[in-house]
Amino acid sequence: MIIHSLLDTDLYKFTMMQAVLHQHPAAQVDYRFKCRTPGVDLAQFIDEISREIDALCRLRLREDEVDYLRSLRFIKPDFADFLALFHLDRKYLALAASAAHPGEIELTIRGPWLHTILFEVPLLAIINEVWFRNTSEPDFEEGRSRLREKVRSLRSMPAGCKIADYGTRRRYSRQWHGELLPLLRDGLGEQFVGTSNVFFAKQYGLTPLGTMAHEYLQAFQALGPRLRDSQVAALDSWAREYRGDLGIALSDVVGLDAFLRDFDLYFCKLFDGMRHDSGDPFDWGERVIAHLEAHRVDPRTKVLVFSDGLNIDKVMRLYEHFSPRCRLAFGVGTSLTNDLGPTPLQIVIKMVRCNGQPVAKLSDSPGKSMCEDLGYLRYLRDVFGLPPMPEAGDPARQ
């Protein structure tokens, strides 16, 4: 059994779920899985994956786990009560071997957003662990050696250069994830600020970290009053739910240009900062700082969070480039939790529909978008004033 607790997921799944409960409990959504790594035959392990999903759907939160969630300042009593009764339902999930693409799997999730939002992260962790335990021998000593070198590199930096673990969805295994976190905590001290994983935050006394994911802003392409106003509607909704708490805005759902047009003086003052998750991070940071300054907001009072494919070398270069012009935070994922030798999988589960309408992410990095509807992608680009997409190519890859 790979997943032992419903807390073994990223915090932002719970923070988004709370907002969904309070504001959009009837929303219906579709998610779709995609493996971007070529030549990966997941279909051969489909029965094993299915058994792990069955086990996941039998889990409920224990009383001490609900109490832990209640202890978080931003979790409201009614949401904790709801979670005490919650479980994932297999009826919302369909898993099959792909007939069109031998070796691939087709994994879709369809149902109420409130009841499906917690599927994504544990499903990705299950698929990763099933793959690696069947295709590689773990070299934990190599992983420890690499981790020690990363700790040494970070400790050579100023104390303000701090990282967090964001690696649940692409980890090598639950066991390795659980081993490396106390090593980081003890090795880095205050340079290790916490983890996105709620289960391990509880177990090791770490700070759980996270605010919102792409799906939250994507959903408002269908939930908001107008498509053009969808980002503003999503950010306003977040502000209503958290009243200034959890104030990191995600900037790349329809690209940085469109985001900055919507992120006006009100949002610049209200939110604590912004998160980078695609595109060139140095260019992104310079543009965000310039945007804040243009709105007479001191960037030194705001946090720039970097979380796109970071390794320790990139963390150090970003810190040296931007410090002390702003506050900085770094969420490191695969480079921490899946660096034992074997090549990590590039797998994702993305929302593709909400209330029957297509939704999409127009990433600042080519290849990171997923959408089933080419016409909608063109329309979305036009509405937000983005360059037309190329005529050729797979729309799911933009």
From Swiss-Prot:
The Gene Ontology terms for molecular function here are: nicotinate phosphoribosyltransferase activity
Which keywords does the record carry?
Ligase, Phosphoprotein, Pyridine nucleotide biosynthesis
Organism superkingdom: Bacteria
Q: What name does UniProt use for this protein?
A: Nicotinate phosphoribosyltransferase
> Which pathway or pathways does this protein act in?
Cofactor biosynthesis; NAD(+) biosynthesis; nicotinate D-ribonucleotide from nicotinate: step 1/1
Q: Where is the signal peptide?
A: none
Pfam annotation, one family = NAPRTase
So what does this thing catalyse? nicotinate + 5-phospho-alpha-D-ribose 1-diphosphate + ATP + H2O = nicotinate beta-D-ribonucleotide + ADP + phosphate + diphosphate
Biological function? Catalyzes the synthesis of beta-nicotinate D-ribonucleotide from nicotinate and 5-phospho-D-ribose 1-phosphate at the expense of ATP.
PANTHER family registered for this protein in UniProt: NICOTINATE PHOSPHORIBOSYLTRANSFERASE
Species: Xanthomonas campestris pv. campestris (strain ATCC 33913 / DSM 3586 / NCPPB 528 / LMG 568 / P 25)
Question: What's in the GO CC field?
Answer: cytosol
**Where is the PTM Phosphohistidine found along the chain?**
214
PTM per Swiss-Prot/TrEMBL: Transiently phosphorylated on a His residue during the reaction cycle. Phosphorylation strongly increases the affinity for substrates and increases the rate of nicotinate D-ribonucleotide production. Dephosphorylation regenerates the low-affinity form of the enzyme, leading to product release.
Q: Which InterPro entries does the protein's record reference?
A: N/Namide_PRibTrfase, NAPRTase_N, Nic_PRibTrfase, Nic_PRibTrfase-Fam, Nicotinate_pribotase-like_C
Q: What family is it from?
A: Belongs to the NAPRTase family.
Which Gene3D superfamilies does the record associate with it? Answer: nicotinate phosphoribosyltransferase
Under Enzyme Commission nomenclature, its number is 6.3.4.21
